[in-house]
Amino acid sequence: AGRPHRIAVTDLIEQQRNLPRHITRVVVAVAHGPGVAELLEESGAVVVRTPPRGRPSTRDFVRAVTSCGAREALLLPSDADSTPVAKAAAEFLRDDDIRVAVVPSRSIVQTLAAVAVHDAASSFDDDVVTMARASSATRYGGVTVASKEAITTAGRCQVGDVLGLVDGDIVEIGADVTAVCQRVIERMSSSTSELVTLVTVLDCPPDLVPAVAAHLQSALVDLEVVAGGQPYWPVIIGVE
């Protein structure tokens, strides 16, 4: 019988990777939680940490690039609201003769996928294409809790309802985080899916990861769990 053949749990705070003062190419990524910020730093990225429901400034992106003396930069906004800011920063940096590309990423799971394939030894253009492909190949979803009554694409929700989203659209309404998470993964998965990534809060329901692992036992799909610590989202989901 099939079963998940790799379950990797990434701890929250372990160590911060120190980047050299001057590097040729830098990856700058936005992060909304301490866990994903640490993971990105350990992967070699310069992280722009943003407050809950906040977005970075143009200066944040520019400073992240110029502080390490890089002449090439890849910017990962990690959400739709930060994308225009990243594009504005890219224009500013180009005026300073820095080669810049904004790699499309609308969720932290797309950013993680892009960073995982970054290759500083490849050409700039090849690196951009590879990272963009990894990002676009990652469907993103999540589970959150309704803060007000509203009419959604999945029906009416009440305060406290658990909402499941896929690619930014509400597709599930329920009462239990784990159950809604499982249904969202079902919607996101296909016969070609290879990896499910869960980015969780610090107080993630203890049954969530075991339940998802059991849920995936019928297919040879990898499961990676990142203790992200992000606000407002009990779990963010990526499927590649």
What are the functions of these language-model segments?
Residues 1-240:
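N-terminal loops that bind phosphate or other acidic moieties
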